[in-house]
Amino acid sequence: MTVRAALVFLLAVGLTGCVTSGDQNPLKTDKGRDEARDAYIQLGLGYLQRGNTEQAKVPLRKALEIDPSSADAHAALAVVFQTEMEPKLADEEYRKALASDSRNARVLNNYGGFLYEQKRYEEAYQRLLEASQDTLYPERSRVFENLGLVSLQMKKPAQAKEYFEKSLRLNRNQPSVALEMADLLYKEREYVPARQYYDLFAQGGGQNARSLLLGIRLAKVFEDRDTAASYGLQLKRLYPGSLEYQEFQAEK
């Protein structure tokens, strides 16, 4: 289970935005420098999205040459190093980004995701909590989902449930969050709401070993033998070597 970083394009600025006619140097004006910086960031993100991290560094470095304090450039470079499994360098870049823009919810959310991957759960929680304060952040539902996932790792299921509920209030179309709610409620023996959340998950989520096992367990609670059998066959066919299949066999 991983926390999803909300990596988005920063500005819709193309490289052609930096080109001017004549002998005028666009980097001599504030507007020209801003456009050049943003174009380089866009180019770097394009390489990053295609999985070419080495090539992504070149335009991102150029962006930082133009604007050494660019939070967006540092944040993008942090994701590059995170992808390359260079945690120390990624951490440094995230910190530089936040030094320039300490309230940037996107950077805080991405940094929280990085800290989660590093199992630094207390730090991740604090960064994500800061990100959640931005009520206008368009990916706020993802922040609450991430807070819920971190809370689970901190052994705080009640707190996790509150965050998952907040996430779903902001965006109902999140199968992964619905599955987390179904799992928590099943463990609390709240079977009716657990099934409701599971049905919400099933409407838009692809099944995996974990979800199939939960579906089997819920079907058994409600004595739905056909559904339990169907999920059992899928689990056997698709995930025969999984821990979930072993648990399913043991529970027969």
Curated annotation (Swiss-Prot):
PROSITE patterns found in the cross-reference section: PROKAR_LIPOPROTEIN, TPR, TPR_REGION
GO BP annotations listed: pilus assembly; secretion; type IV pilus assembly; type IV pilus-dependent motility
S-diacylglycerol cysteine-type lipidated residues: C18
TPR repeats: 32-67, 84-101, 104-133, 139-171, 174-203, 208-235
Keyword list, A-Z: Cell outer membrane, Lipoprotein, Membrane, Palmitate, Repeat, Signal, TPR repeat
InterPro entries hit by this protein: Pilus_4_PilW, TPR-like_helical_dom_sf, TPR_rpt
Compartments, record wording: Cell outer membrane
Residues with lipid group (N-palmitoyl cysteine): C18
Annotated signal sequence range: 1-17
SUPFAM superfamilies: TPR-like (SSF48452)
Membrane disposition: Lipid-anchor
Pfam families (alphabetical): TPR_11, TPR_12
Keyword Membrane: yes
Disulfide bonds: none
Effect of a null allele: Mutant shows an impaired export/assembly of the fimbrial subunit PilA, and accumulates this protein in the membrane fraction. In addition, loss of PilF expression abolishes multimerization of PilQ.
GO CC terms, sorted: cell outer membrane
Top-level lineage group: Bacteria
GO MF assignments: TPR domain binding
Free-text comment about domains: Contains six tetratricopeptide (TPR) protein-protein interaction motifs. TPR1-TPR4 form the minimal region required for secretin assembly and function.
SUBUNIT field: Interacts with PilQ; this interaction is essential for assemby of PilQ into secretins.
Functional summary from the UniProt entry: Essential component of the type IV pilus (T4P) that plays a role in surface and host cell adhesion, colonization, biofilm maturation, virulence, and twitching, a form of surface-associated motility facilitated by cycles of extension, adhesion, and retraction of T4P fibers. Plays an essential role in the outer membrane localization and assembly of PilQ into secretins which are dodecamers of PilQ.
The protein's name in its UniProt record: Type IV pilus assembly protein PilF
UniProt lineage: Bacteria, Pseudomonadati, Pseudomonadota, Gammaproteobacteria, Pseudomonadales
Gene this protein is translated from: pilF
